[in-house]
Amino acid sequence: MKLTDFKILTFDCYGTLIDWETGMVNALAPLTARVKTTLTRDQILEAHARHESAQQRWTPARRYSELLAIVYKRLAEEWGVAASWEEALAYGRSIKDWPAFADTAGALQYLKKYYRLAILSNVDNASFALSNVRLQVEFDAIFTAEDIGSYKPSARNFDYMLEKLDGMGIAKSEVLHTAESLFHDHEPATAAGLATCWIHRRHAEGGFGATMKPATEPKVDFRFTSMAELAKAHQEALRG
């Protein structure tokens, strides 16, 4: 299997292209500053992952920005801090401020020359439109949790994407699903029979940060630590 075997790269957005962990920690700072004990970055992210994953299972049709507001309130309760709904709703709106990784735009612009590009993201349409400005590339297809009515790792999200791609004349064998999260993406993508590329952004930190630990460690077909590394590997593949 070679990187040049594929017609389309389907990307997770948050955690892969957008640095959601930095965005979350920054946006939660007014809340965590009021917690009596000192929380590490990973303690904040792991608590967020627990509440977010549970809420996505309970209310799969709720828009992501609204779901984040509920997560904010759950975190405040867990940490014993009073928090208003105004604060919680502001946190839900913070998605627009989450930064892109420094290598994202350049790598996407390079890859766009050789592949069709698509997004499969646990987000609402309005929030993704704001993040998309930071990605600086035109995607051939965008599939959001809001449109699908469920959140990854639901198999429904991958079935939906594959059905839409089939309508674009793209076979499953021509798709390389590219993502950071083993839990949200690689486990269900592997179950769906997709080839996968792991952008292991957390290679230096270890742990799972803002994502849950997968039930099993899925096999991945390609592994890189950044989008820049993926683009470089593609250049090398072209040279043979």
List each model region and its residues.
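Asp-based, Mg2+/Mn2+-dependent phosphohydrolase catalytic module
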Residues: 1-9, 37, 83, 105, ...
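N-terminal helical cap/lid subdomain that shapes the substrate entry/recognition surface
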Residues: 3-102, 113
